[in-house]
UniProtKB/Swiss-Prot annotation:
Top-level taxon of origin: Bacteria
Stated name of the protein: Pantothenate kinase
Entry binding sites for ATP: G90, S91, V92, A93, V94, G95, K96, S97
EC number(s) per entry: 2.7.1.33
One GO cellular component, as annotated: cytoplasm
Subcellular location field: Cytoplasm
Pathway: Cofactor biosynthesis; coenzyme A biosynthesis; CoA from (R)-pantothenate: step 1/5
GO biological process, one term: coenzyme A biosynthetic process
Annotated Pfam families: PRK
Keyword set includes Cell membrane: no
Catalysed reaction equations from the record: (R)-pantothenate + ATP = (R)-4'-phosphopantothenate + ADP + H(+)
Family to which the UniProt record says this protein belongs: Belongs to the prokaryotic pantothenate kinase family.
HAMAP family, per the entry: Pantothen_kinase_1
Amino acid sequence: MNDYNHYFHFPREEWRKLEVSKDQILTAEELEEIRGLNDRISLQDISEIYLPLIKLIAIQYHEAIFIHGEKMEYLKKKESRAPFIIALAGSVAVGKSTTARVFKLMLDRWFSKTRQVELVTTDGFLYPNKVLEERGIMDKKGFPESYDRDRFAKFLTDLKANKEDVEIPLYSHFTYDVLDETRVIHNPDIVIIEGINVLQADQHESLFPSDFFDFSVYMDANEADIKKWYLERFFMLRETAFQDESSYFHPYTKISKQEAETFALGVWDTINGVNLKENIEKTKYRADLVLQKGTDHLISDIYLRK
C-alpha cells in the first residue's frame, strides 16, 4: 500500500526552501560525534532537512503549551503540561539512532537549553535474553512479543501523568542484553522516544503507545537499501566493536568473511527483514511525518500529515 493521500508531499528541493530564522546550529565536528556507524548524514541534510523540521516541531511544541495554558485558565486549574513526546520509528539500520541524537542536540540549541530534552530508546524495554530464551522467542528479538509492553506503557503513563522522576531501563548493544541498571529522568520538557516498535499497536490493549505522542516521525527507505546498509554496518562492527572478546558477537570475528556474510544475511532474511515487512513498515502511515531516504542516505522526500 502506498497511501499518502492524507499527507502533504515535499520533494527535497521544496522542503529546503522553507524559511528558518536560525542559522546552522550544528558544526561538522559535532555531527561527526553523534553520527552512527555507516550513517552518512551530512551538514547539508542538517541545514536543508532537519533545521526546517526542528522549526516545525518547535511550532507544535509552543502550540501545545499555549492550548494547555488556555485550558488550565478556563478550568481554573494549576497544573503544568506533561512532557511533549516525539516518537521516531523505522527499520533496523535505517538511521533512527543518529536522527534521534540530531533531534536532541538541535532542540537543545533551538531552545538555547531553556528546555530539558531527553532521549530514550525502546531497546531497554526488551525482555532480558534469559526471558526470551525461556519463552523460546530469542529468534524473535525485536518483534512485538519480545518487548515488555506493560513496562513501556507504565513509562509512558508516568510521563504523561507528570511524575517528577521516571525510570528508564537500559540496554547494551555490546552484550546484546538489557542491563541491570536504570536511568532516571527528572521533569523533562521534551522526550524523544526512538525505536522500531514505537508506532506499533496491540489490538488487545486499551491504550496504544501512539495515544501518548505529540509528534511522530517514521524513517523510510527501500528494503534493498536498508538490507545493504545493515550488512555494511555488520562488517564495520566486525572489524571494530566485535573484536572485543566481551562482545556478544565476538565469535563472528573468528569465522571467514563468507561465513560471516551468510550469518548476517540469515539474520536479515529470517528476523530483521521479516519484522520490517510484518510489523514495522505497516506503522508508517500512523506517523505525522515520513522521511524518505534514497540509496545515497540523503533524505529525498518528506511527507507531512495534513
